[in-house]
């Protein structure tokens, strides 16, 4: 199984979020800034739009994933994110 989605050499991170979540907005902004200049992308997914995701994560957002691997939750764990970025550069 692959670590995460890849599209033309570009690896996608998934940010599980919900509308009106300030922590989600903060994490999205920080991750986008840190990914700037890299081939990687960020795909936000609203957990409220999918009953299975809403049941799985409830209010436990934001969550940042690469494929099935969780990188961090609730706030950006900069050391963990930088470790992921080094491993995927």
What name fits each language-model region?
Residues 70-77:
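N-terminal, polar/charged subdomain of small-to-medium soluble alpha/beta proteins
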Residues 35-39:
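Short helix-capping segments at alpha-helix termini
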Residues 40-51:
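Thiol-based oxidoreductase modules, predominantly thioredoxin-like and allied folds used
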Residues 2-33:
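Local sequence-structure signature of Cys/Sec-based thiol-disulfide redox active-site neighborhoods
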Residues 61-70:
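A short, hydrophobic beta-strand/beta-hairpin element that forms part of a small beta-sheet core
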Residues 81-89:
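Thiol-/selenol-based redox modules, centered on thioredoxin-like
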């Amino acid at each position: 199984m692959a670590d995460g989605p890849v599209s033309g050499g570009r690896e996608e991170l998934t940010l599980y979020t919900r509308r009106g979540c300030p922590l989600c907005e903060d994490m999205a902004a920080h991750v986008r800034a840190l990914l700037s200049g890299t081939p990687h992308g960020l795909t936000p997914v609203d957990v409220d739009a999918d009953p299975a995701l809403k049941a799985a994560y409830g209010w436990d957002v934001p969550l940042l994933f690469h494929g099935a691997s969780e990188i961090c939750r609730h706030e950006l764990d900069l050391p963990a994110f930088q470790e992921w970025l080094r491993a995927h550069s």
